[in-house]
């Protein structure tokens, strides 16, 4: 990577192709260091994948590619565009066999000849359901429906490990009044208030109630090739703030106020090949202000929490073992500051705080019983997202000013963890009012091996990086729907695509923008 950074970058030749139309709708047939790339040995295709939290744990998104086609969520359907020859070509529209016209496609997976679609549905009783469809895409322009599944609740997120998908939906249990509890517990009435998966109520021994709450998460697991055959189902009633998924466990966390103190409860659920098993719970003072502020490595869970009140803010780093017992803690970090971005890798955690001095921190987590703060660097501006660039560099994407009117890219040199250095920075103006990359890591493309950094604001900005020259703009592709969510940068070999909201911009990766 270092040698690649020192090479002069080739010129980008912008060959503008915008795809917004397509063929007629087709009725379906019944019947981390994270590198965002896949190299197919069979056909030597090098193409990007979704930016994910955990290496080895795939995540659904609104745009996917298998190196031959681009699959994009578009107005309640999926558009499938042929990119075999580079330039976007033949396109097909797939509209799932919805339960009702108001159903919406949320996200999808594409792997090994299979397309898995997640949708939201409002049933006849006015309750939310998550419905998943699985398609055989051996011929991507003629997808064949092979199975479906449903579960109560509004779709929240999902994860895929191998061929097993875990789907999470937010639900609420309307507990019956005391005077009618006996009637409600009648098996004939249970389906009125107990969540269901594929029309079957969840077994009582698979429902876990953490506290006095009526909201929680339904989790189901199944093979992508046969979603109708549910492997396992669980429901955890914990307030459903968010979930972090490692390679072998889920950690559900939710914040609550108790006696004017912020408490975040974290509950562990282990899994193997789709079978889920509940574990222990713990709690920390404060809340998690960044999705990457929680991480599991080597059997330990690390949590970077922020506590704030009317007077000040303070942060702390907690370490828990497999039984969720605290083994170590680092208190009193950056008083008066809020954690805005974090990233765990190897024996270190890197994080940015923001409010007054906006420092970049490095903490050593080699010893789970004794985490230590190693280095601190005060910088202007602040990062909302951190990404590991290589063994000695961390990329930051954020804002150059408190008004968020400028975007700032930063490359931190962490070769000496005790003395981090801002190696290069780039601050640029933009005409947008929203940058999805700041709130959704899946909207970011970072590929050190191809020297690409991309994200959308008012345009799609694509940069390269050289330690001597800094960040260099490769392209700023215009977007039909400026400031919209859902645009993704995708590459296949030397072809680059900006796909989202029904359009595809295409250009060749042949050099920096002149």
Predicted segments, located by residue:
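Beta-sheet-rich non-transmembrane sensory/scaffold domains
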Residues: 1-514
């Amino acid at each position: 990577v270092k040698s690649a950074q020192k090479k002069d970058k080739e010129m980008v030749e912008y060959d503008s192709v915008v795809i917004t139309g397509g063929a007629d709708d087709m009725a379906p047939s019944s019947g981390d260091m994270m590198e965002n790339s896949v190299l197919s040995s069979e056909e030597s295709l090098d193409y990007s994948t979704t930016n994910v939290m955990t290496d080895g744990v795939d995540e659904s998104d609104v745009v996917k590619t298998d190196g031959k086609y681009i699959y994009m969520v578009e107005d309640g359907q999926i558009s499938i565009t042929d990119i075999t020859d580079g330039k976007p070509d033949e396109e097909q529209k797939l509209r799932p066999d919805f339960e009702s016209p108001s159903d919406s496609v949320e996200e999808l997976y594409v792997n090994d000849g299979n397309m898995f679609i997640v949708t939201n549905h409002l049933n006849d009783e006015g309750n939310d359901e998550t419905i998943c469809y699985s398609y055989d895409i051996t011929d991507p322009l003629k997808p064949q429906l092979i199975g479906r599944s449903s579960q109560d609740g509004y779709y929240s997120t999902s994860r895929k490990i191998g061929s097993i998908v875990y789907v999470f939906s937010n639900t609420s249990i309307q507990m019956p009044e005391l005077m009618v509890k006996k009637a409600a517990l009648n098996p004939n009435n249970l389906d009125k208030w107990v969540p269901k998966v594929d029309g079957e109520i969840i077994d009582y021994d698979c429902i876990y109630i953490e506290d006095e709450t009526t909201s929680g998460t339904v989790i189901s697991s199944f093979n992508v090739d046969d979603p109708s055959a549910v492997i396992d189902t669980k429901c955890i009633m914990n307030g459903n703030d968010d979930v972090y998924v490692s390679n072998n466990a889920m950690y559900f966390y939710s914040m609550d106020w108790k006696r004017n103190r912020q408490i975040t409860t974290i509950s562990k659920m282990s899994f193997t090949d789709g079978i889920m098993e509940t574990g222990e719970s713990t709690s920390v003072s404060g809340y998690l202000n960044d999705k990457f502020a929680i991480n599991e490595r080597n059997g330990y869970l690390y949590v970077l929490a922020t506590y704030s009140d009317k007077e000040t803010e303070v942060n702390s780093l907690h370490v828990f073992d497999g039984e969720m017992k605290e083994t170590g803690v680092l208190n009193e970090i950056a008083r008066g500051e809020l954690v805005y971005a974090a990233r765990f890798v190897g024996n270190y955690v890197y994080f940015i705080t923001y409010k007054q001095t906006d420092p970049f921190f490095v903490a050593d987590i080699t010893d789970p019983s004794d985490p230590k703060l190693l280095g601190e660097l005060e910088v202007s501006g602040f990062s909302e997202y951190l990404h590991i660039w290589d063994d000695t560099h961390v990329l930051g994407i954020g804002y150059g000013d408190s008004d968020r009117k400028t975007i700032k890219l930063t490359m931190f040199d962490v070769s000496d963890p005790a003395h981090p250095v801002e190696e290069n920075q780039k601050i640029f103006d933009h005409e947008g009012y929203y940058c999805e990359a700041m709130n959704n890591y899946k909207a970011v493309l970072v590929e050190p091996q191809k020297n690409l950094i991309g994200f959308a604001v008012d345009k799609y900005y694509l940069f390269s990086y050289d330690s001597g020259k800094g960040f260099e703009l490769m392209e700023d592709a215009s977007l039909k729907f400026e400031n919209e969510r859902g645009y993704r940068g995708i590459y296949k070999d030397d072809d680059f695509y900006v796909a989202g909201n029904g359009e595809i911009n295409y250009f060749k990766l042949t050099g920096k923008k002149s």
